[in-house]
Regions:
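The feature captures the beta-strand-to-loop junction immediately N-terminal to the Walker
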Residues: 44-46
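Helix-to-loop junction immediately C-terminal to a conserved catalytic motif
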Residues: 59
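Short coil-to-helix segment of the ABC ATPase nucleotide-binding domain corresponding to the Q-loop/switch region
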Residues: 90-97
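Conserved ABC ATPase "signature" region
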Residues: 108-126, 178
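Conserved ABC ATPase signature
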Residues: 130-134, 138
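A short, proline-enriched helix->beta-strand linker immediately N-terminal to the Walker B motif
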Residues: 149-153
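Catalytic Walker B motif of ABC-type/P-loop ATPase nucleotide-binding domains
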Residues: 155-158
Length: 254
C-alpha cells in the first residue's frame, strides 16, 4: 500500500491496448478516477469503449500497458459477471459455499454464515434448490451472496442485470443495492443503462468512445420519500435532469 493513498481505489493514468497480428488498438487512454470507502460508483460509456476491460484490469485479469491501479492495503475485490454462472448440479447452498470451500474455510463457521445470509436475503426456503428451480432474480441474489462470501472490500459489477427482463431488473437492482448497503460494501458498476446508473450510484463516471478517457464525473443527489432505493430514485424530481445530463455527455460530438 502506498503511504499517500487516500482512497479505497485509485486508477492513475491507466492505458491499455489490444495487440494482434494486425496491429495495436488503444482501448483505454490515461484513465484517472478514484473510489471512496462505502461509495457506489457507476461507469457508463459508448458500446465497445472498454468498460469491461477496465474491470478486468482492476481485478488483475489483465495487466495495463502503463499507469497504475492502487487498492488499499490487503483489500480484496469480488467480481460479479453478466451471467450468474451458478453450477447447475449444485444446490443454492453449495453454490454459495464454493469460494470458501476452495479457500478451505472452517465448515462450521461457513454453515452458520451461509444460513444467516440465506435468511437475511429471502433464500432460506431455497437452500436445497438447484439453479433451474430459481427465478432470475433469485439466481442473481444467490450469485451476489456467493461473491460476498469471499468478503471483498470492493465489488465489481459487470452489467449484472443485463440478462433479466425489465420488471425483474427493477426488483433485483433494489435487492442488490439493499444487500450492498446492509453489508457496507464499496461497489463499482458497469452498465449501458443510464437510468440504472442514476438510480443506484452515488457518482457516475462517463467514459468517452474508444480510446476511452474520463469525460465527466457526476455526483448523484436525489430527493426520495423516505430512504433512497433504486426504484424510488426513478421517481425523484431530479432524475430526469440527471438523465438528460448523462445522455448529452454520451452523445456529444467529439
Amino acid at each position: 500500500m502506498r503511504a499517500d493513498l487516500k482512497h479505497l481505489l485509485e486508477v492513475n493514468n491507466l492505458s491499455y491496448a489490444y495487440h494482434t497480428l494486425q496491429g495495436e488498438t488503444l482501448v483505454l487512454d490515461h484513465v484517472n478516477f478514484s473510489i471512496e470507502q462505502g461509495e457506489f460508483v457507476a461507469i457508463v460509456g459508448p458500446s465497445g469503449c472498454g468498460k469491461s476491460t477496465l474491470l478486468s484490469l482492476i481485478c488483475h485479469l489483465l495487466e495495463p500497458d502503463s499507469g497504475e491501479i492502487v487498492l488499499g492495503d490487503h483489500k480484496k475485490t469480488g467480481y460479479m459477471l453478466q451471467k450468474d454462472h451458478l453450477l447447475e448440479w449444485r444446490t443454492t447452498y453449495k453454490n454459495i459455499a464454493l469460494g470458501p470451500e476452495i479457500a478451505r474455510q472452517s465448515s462450521l463457521d461457513l454453515s452458520k454464515k451461509i444460513d444467516t445470509m440465506l435468511t437475511n436475503y429471502q433464500l432460506d426456503g431455497f437452500r436445497n434448490a438447484k439453479p433451474n428451480q430459481l427465478s432470475g432474480g433469485m439466481r442473481q441474489r444467490a450469485a451476489l451472496i456467493r461473491t460476498l462470501m469471499t468478503e471483498p472490500d470492493l465489488l465489481l459489477l459487470d452489467e449484472p442485470f443485463s440478462a433479466l427482463d425489465y420488471q425483474t431488473r427493477l426488483s433485483v437492482s433494489d435487492d442488490v443495492w439493499d444487500i450492498l448497503k446492509h453489508e457496507k460494501k464499496t461497489a463499482l458498476l458497469i452498465t449501458h443503462d443510464i437510468s440504472e446508473a442514476i438510480s443506484m450510484a452515488d457518482r457516475i463516471i462517463i467514459l468517452s468512445a474508444r480510446p476511452a478517457t474520463v469525460k465527466k464525473e457526476i455526483p448523484v443527489k436525489l430527493s426520495c420519500p423516505g430512504e433512497r432505493t433504486p426504484f424510488l430514485s426513478r421517481s425523484s424530481p431530479e432524475f430526469k435532469d440527471y438523465f438528460n445530463l448523462v445522455w448529452k455527455e454520451l452523445n456529444h460530438d467529439e
